[in-house]
């Protein structure tokens, strides 16, 4: 993976480093959406095979990609893609995207920086599209649409979107 780094407003976007893969499990937990006021989801949900595939052995496949946002010396969030049969699967050639931030870093534009950086990285590598899924009630659904993603399908309350990169 080429070295890629950007700094905007005190936020550094860089590739996830060797030894930081454990953070993806933390961010996967943060990516599990729950309505405002709902109790926290038990961490045991991360043992479900449908979720484990988002992080298990991440980095072993040649096309696994992850960018981290660093604020004040701490990894505040991450965006990662891999080809898999996840909630947002559209075809075997399209990688699926996941993104999450720790709660205290949300609403500051860091997610937008991460998403745009990953889309640009994929574009540079010749990828033509990336998919994702988001629950219909999640505020992030409107954000993805504003960022140029297109609604492709709805499956059991999950919106499947595609961001075209060509």
List the model feature ranges, each with a label.
Residues 1-8:
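Short acidic N-proximal helix/loop "leader" segments that mark the beginning
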Residues 11-26:
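A short beta-loop-alpha structural element at the N-terminal edge
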Residues 16, 99-101, 134:
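Hydrophobic adenine-recognition pocket in adenosine-nucleotide-binding enzymes
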Residues 32-34, 41-93, 98-102:
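Acetyl-CoA-dependent GNAT
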Residues 98, 107-120, 124, 145-146:
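Conserved acetyl-CoA-binding loop-helix of GNAT-fold acetyltransferases
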Residues 111, 115, 137-140, 157-162:
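Short glycine/proline-centered loop/turn elements that form peptide/ligand docking sites
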Residues 122-135:
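Conserved GNAT acetyl-CoA-binding A-motif
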Residues 145-155:
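Conserved acetyl-CoA-binding loop of GNAT-fold acetyltransferases
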């Amino acid at each position: 993976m080429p070295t890629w780094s950007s700094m905007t407003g005190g936020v550094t976007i860089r590739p996830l480093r060797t030894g930081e893969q454990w953070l993806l499990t933390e961010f996967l937990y943060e990516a599990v959406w729950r309505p405002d006021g709902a109790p926290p989801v038990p961490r045991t949900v991360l043992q479900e095979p449908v979720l484990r595939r988002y992080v298990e052995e991440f980095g072993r496949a040649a096309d696994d990609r992850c960018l981290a946002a660093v604020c004040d010396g701490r990894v505040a969030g991450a965006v990662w893609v891999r080809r898999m049969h996840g909630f947002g699967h559209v075809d075997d050639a399209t990688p699926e995207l996941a993104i999450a931030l720790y709660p205290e870093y949300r609403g500051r534009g860091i997610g937008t920086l991460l998403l745009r950086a990953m889309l640009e990285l994929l574009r540079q590598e010749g990828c033509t599209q990336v998919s994702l899924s988001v629950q219909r009630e999640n505020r992030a659904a409107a954000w993805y649409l504003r960022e140029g993603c297109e609604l492709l399908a709805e499956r059991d309350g999950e919106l499947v979107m595609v961001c075209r990169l060509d």
